[in-house]
């Protein structure tokens, strides 16, 4: 079941145009929406979750008109926002039971079965009696997924889910999302390139409300093969290199600067070909849009 987004635009009262004729087709599986903070990702997530209205455009999930059939859509939707509140003095088991009741699971025995199944699925069953205030960031995120999965949603939206997680929690959380993507449409909004490269079979890059690229990550990387060159340079060399070549990113390496250049031919003496990755795709797509300073983020430890 595809999620089809057509010509969706949104301008806020202060004049900021958050989305500009966004057009995407999102198939079943993991789909990554990648972009910097302020790119319009969260606005699109809220619109898809029926929490906000676009100014124009249409959205369909299969035959369902998302904008005009909100109640029907919400029955099939799971949403994990970037930030959400929890009751710190309530246990995970008790709060999930309460949410299941609100979701329409009326029978006590049925709720007990649902709660146990979900807490086991997100690996929180052994700590079900623990108060949520004592949960780590990763545990809270996994509890949020359990809430989002109430009602067996056909579509799951997760907004910046790994921000602030330690490496081990991040791996557990991404593995959980990968399992969910086998049977559902899972839309992952993130500014972390590794999240997309490790999980998603399709992706889009968004900036300033515009879709700049829509592709399969592996194919996008392959299209850069033979075009990425690298060389360690001094800071003093960088301005001239930027004037003469398409420098897509720089990274400090042992006190010196490692520059990546996108070019069909060797940019100059000392440059060597580099194996492209999804970071190169991202920075090549964003080149010229994020200012002169394009520092490559430190990789997230596995």
Task: Name each region found by the language model.
Residues 97, 101-104, 109-127:
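Conserved ABC ATPase "signature" region
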Residues 49:
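Helix-to-loop junction immediately C-terminal to a conserved catalytic motif
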